[in-house]
Amino acid sequence: MAFDGTWKIERNENYEKFMEAMGVGMMKRKLGAHDNLKITIRQEGNKFIVKEASNFRNIEIEFTLGVNFEYSLADGTELSGAWTLEGNKLVGTFTRKDNGKVLKAYREIVGDELIQTYIYEGVESKRVFKR
């Protein structure tokens, strides 16, 4: 599938503002902007296995399209939600457990890049990865 492979962070757009909107403290925002994140994605039908490796943590997440699951961000924020596939774009809708606010996430392949877009409380950020 198109998402399959290992992707390394290339650049961020508005990521610190997004983290600030999410309530991440200044020190963690500075560190998070330089996390050297590498994502490995494997798709098996409707099931995805995503491995995230960064300077701060290494985790593996398994999810099935359309099925709710629990997830914790690197700063400890707990979320519940699901990914769906809309055309060639993965669309995630997650609700924060602490305040009930919604985080939207998108993953799509554009050329040779994986673009992750986050939208929270009107703040949009992009993280761009290359294989």
Task: Mark where each language-model region is.
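Hydrophobic small-molecule pocket/channel-lining residues, especially in calycin-type beta-barrels
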Residues: 1-131
